[in-house]
Design a protein with these regions (language model features):
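Positively charged
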Residues: 1-198
C-alpha cells in the first residue's frame, strides 16, 4: 500500500547520531607544552581522528564556559583549536593568519591556562584566517571584534605564546599581584566559613 504525504512536517527525519566524546583535562599552568610551537596536524596519520579531537575540544570548551581553546592547553600536540559558543563551534586545523587589520583594539583578555588573570591586550581588530576543516579541506574565513581576538589568542597559544606575553613585565607583575591578593582573600574567607560551620 502506498502512503501519500501531504506535508513534509509529517516525515520524521532519522535521528542524528552524534558521537559522545569525553572532554580533555586542562594542562597545568606550568606545562612545557604551553610554551611550545605545535607542529602541523597530519590528516594522513591513522591514529589521529579529527572528529574526535575537535569534539573533545568542543566539550572541554563548553565545560569551562570558554569561547575558544587550543589542543595544547589540554596537553595534546595537535595543531588545532576550536572557537565558538553554545552549539556553534568551528574546529581550525593548521590555522594561519593571512591578513590582519592595521586598526587595533586594547581590551581585557583571560584564558584557561591562566585562570583569573585579566590583562588588557592590544591586537588587530580583524583577521583573515586560512585553516583546514575536519575533512582536511582548506577554508578561509574573516573575523572581526571578539571572534577575531579569540582566534588570535588561540593561534598564539599553538605557537607557544601565552596572552601574558603580549603585555609588558610591569603590567603582568601588577596583574599577578592583584590576582594573588584576590586568591588569598578568597581562601581566607572560605577558611573562615569552614571554621564557623564546625
Amino acid at each position: 500500500m502506498q502512503e501519500i504525504v501531504y506535508n513534509t512536517n509529517e516525515l520524521n527525519p532519522p535521528a542524528k547520531i552524534v558521537p559522545e566524546f569525553e572532554p580533555y583535562t586542562l594542562a597545568p599552568q606550568d606545562a612545557e607544552i604551553l610554551g611550545s610551537k605545535i607542529q602541523i596536524f597530519d590528516f594522513g596519520y591513522p591514529n589521529h581522528d579529527p572528529l574526535e579531537i575537535g569534539s573533545r575540544l568542543v566539550e572541554t570548551a563548553k565545560l569551562h564556559n570558554s569561547f575558544g581553546i587550543a589542543a595544547n592547553q589540554c596537553g595534546e600536540r595537535y595543531r588545532v583549536f576550536v572557537a565558538g559558543a553554545d552549539e556553534n563551534y568551528i574546529a581550525f586545523f593548521n590555522p594561519e593568519i593571512i591578513l590582519e587589520s592595521e586598526e587595533t583594539s586594547l581590551i581585557p583578555e583571560t584564558d584557561l591556562s591562566n585562570m583569573g588573570l585579566l590583562l588588557h591586550v592590544k591586537r588587530p581588530k580583524s583577521v583573515t584566517v586560512q585553516f583546514q576543516d575536519l575533512n582536511g579541506q582548506l577554508q578561509t574565513l574573516h573575523f572581526d571584534g571578539l571572534t577575531a581576538r579569540i582566534v588570535q589568542q588561540c593561534i598564539d597559544r599553538l605557537n607557544g605564546i601565552g596572552f601574558e606575553m603580549r603585555v609588558s613585565k610591569l603590567v603582568l607583575d601588577r596583574a599577578t599581584k592583584a590576582l594573588d591578593k584576590k586568591v588569598k582573600k578568597f581562601v581566607k574567607q572560605n577558611t573562615y566559613i569552614k571554621t564557623v560551620r564546625k
